[in-house]
Amino acid sequence: MHGYRTYNMESHHAHHDASPVDQKPLVVDLLATQYGKPQTPPPSPNECLSSPDNSLNGSRGSEIPADPSVRRYRTAFTRDQLGRLEKEFYKENYVSRPRRCELAAQLNLPESTIKVWFQNRRMKDKRQRIAVAWPYAAVYSDPAFAASILQAAANSVGMPYPPYAPAAAAAAAAAAAVATNPMMATGMPPMGMPQMPTMQMPGHSGHAGHPSPYGQYRYTPYHIPARPAPPHPAGPHMHHPHMMGSSATGSSYSAGAAGLLGALPSATCYTGLGVGVPKTQTPPLDLQSSSSPHSSTLSLSPVGSDHAKVFDRSPVAQSAPSVPAPAPLTTTSPLPAPGLLMPSAKRPASDMSPPPTTTVIAEPKPKLFKPYKTEA
């Protein structure tokens, strides 16, 4: 056998008078201790009495394993034991040795096990406290880390803004295009101009497309200057369509432009034509109704009679050389237009409106649109 050695009595062959019992060989077990079954020592000598599971291992309780790396089994606590230990922990985190002995006697647990449980419970409590207060502790201890946290928070808050940025940019681009290139605005009154109010109105009218309150603060800067800005393109918008189309189309374009822009200069210009009320919406309706008699009297003019600002454009078809000089002046005074008596008769109604604003706006515009007058 591998782990056994047989010893025979040397005197067996020498002394033949030995008893038959001496003739039997003696077998000694020389198996190393590390090959034996690992024995789990109790944490304390009282373990054998406290735990019923170890009652069968009572004989092995006094044995100590030769290998110190052998790990003992994990202690299983009952609900009653855990509840009692938790109550004691809430009363006092650090328990003295006499108190641990009392708990060991009450819970039928070894004193060393109770000591280890309190150590683990204190570490668990420490981890919980750190997990709850880690942002504040890190912010106060490390300024760089605090700056990174603030930057991340700012980036997360800025997320709602990008969807509104394209709309604001489009509104600004449309306003810039109309202001810089009035020629483009002639064909865009019904199409291009309404886009600017729709993008800028959510902040005030509260369209369903932009319910977020961020739209108000983002679009307000673009919406406020949009109202005073129309006076500059207002001249081309009111003049261009009438030069391009007939009297009926001119009146419809004027109604659309006045309704979309809602600028005061447009209302004041209409008052000089016989409209007493300086409202932004009512003049186009009155002018359309009153345009029929004027257009009948001035059948040769390509411009609707509702626009007396272009008074020199109606005679332009009849006499071309007289147009360039009196065109800007006719907006305020009806004297240069000998064929049109309507503005001169209804001039007292336009005294209340400020004429200098219309004169400054109308001066450069007719020069730009002379080709339209010649085509008409």
Curated annotation (Swiss-Prot):
A GO molecular function held by the record: RNA polymerase II cis-regulatory region sequence-specific DNA binding
GO biological process, one term: negative regulation of transcription by RNA polymerase II
Residue ranges the UniProt entry marks as DNA-binding: 70-129
Location relative to the cell: Nucleus
Polar residues bias (residue ranges): 47-60
UniProt keyword terms in alphabetical order: Developmental protein, DNA-binding, Homeobox, Nucleus, Pair-rule protein, Transcription, Transcription regulation
Gene3D superfamilies reported in the protein's UniProt record: Homeodomain-like (1.10.10.60)
Highest taxon of source: Eukaryota
Predominant subcellular localization, coarse grouping: nucleus
Renumbered residue ranges of the record's region Disordered: 1-22, 34-67, 229-248, 281-376
Biased composition, class Basic and acidic residues, residue ranges: 10-19
Bias type Low complexity, positions: 283-302, 314-334
GO CC annotations, alphabetized: nucleus
Annotated coiled-coil segments of the chain: none
PANTHER family: SEGMENTATION PROTEIN EVEN-SKIPPED
Similarity annotation: Belongs to the even-skipped homeobox family.
Annotated function: May play a role in determining neuronal identity. May be directly involved in specifying identity of individual neurons. Pair-rule protein required for segmentation; involved in transforming the broad, spatial, aperiodic expression patterns of the gap genes into a system of precise periodic expression patterns of the pair-rule and segmentary polarity genes.
Protein name: Segmentation protein even-skipped
